[in-house]
Design a protein with these regions (language model features):
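Two-component histidine phosphotransfer core
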Residues: 1-179
């Protein structure tokens, strides 16, 4: 069941990126389009490499997140900056395993929906080890989840990636420390 949910995630993510690339193509910015396609190919290669794995290292996840956010910056109509911080209490990021494609959908949701009314967006992703648990925080200076939900009620948009990710977390939570 976990694998089936993960497989739903990847096509949805790819669809979103391809729509962004299409928009760039329609704008006529050829150099930016080529750079974006190159960045997407690096990201896609990483996703495909990890697609058969149930878990990846935190270092791999951070690398994929960085590639994704850099790609999103290229495609976004709103400017935003990002930071990724790992406070791991002397633990190597290559020693920590997390489920594949678990954090990225939440960052994707933030990038796509948080900055509607913000001049310059900021995204901060942090990983911290406390009491043998890995905590992940995704913070932005956008409109806030309550306002986003209110606006979402008035639209037909349905966040498949968040729904699938929440289902994956629910499946993982009884047997592990993810939630």
């Amino acid at each position: 069941e976990q694998k089936a949910l993960q497989l739903q995630m990847n096509p949805h993510f790819i669809f979103n990126v391809l729509n962004g690339i299409k928009a760039l193509g329609n704008s006529g910015k050829i150099e930016e389009l080529n750079a974006t396609i190159s960045k997407f190919s690096v990201l896609l290669r990483g996703i495909l490499h990890n697609s058969r794995k149930e878990e990846i290292t935190l270092q791999e996840e951070i690398s994929l997140l960085k590639n994704y956010i850099e790609l999103a910056q290229r495609m976004s109509s709103k400017s935003f900056t990002f930071t990724i911080v790992a406070n791991l209490n002397n633990t190597d990021a290559d020693e920590i395993l997390i489920p594949t494609m678990l954090v990225q959908p939440f960052v994707e949701n933030c990038v796509q929906h948080a900055f509607k009314d913000t001049t310059l967006g900021e995204v901060s992703v942090s990983f911290e080890v406390k009491h043998h648990f890995l905590y992940c925080s995704i913070i932005d200076n956008g409109i806030g989840i309550h306002e986003a939900k209110k606006r979402k009620e008035n639209s037909i948009h349905n966040s498949v990636s968040l729904k699938v990710s929440k289902e994956r977390l629910h499946i993982l939570s009884p047997k592990s420390s993810f939630f």
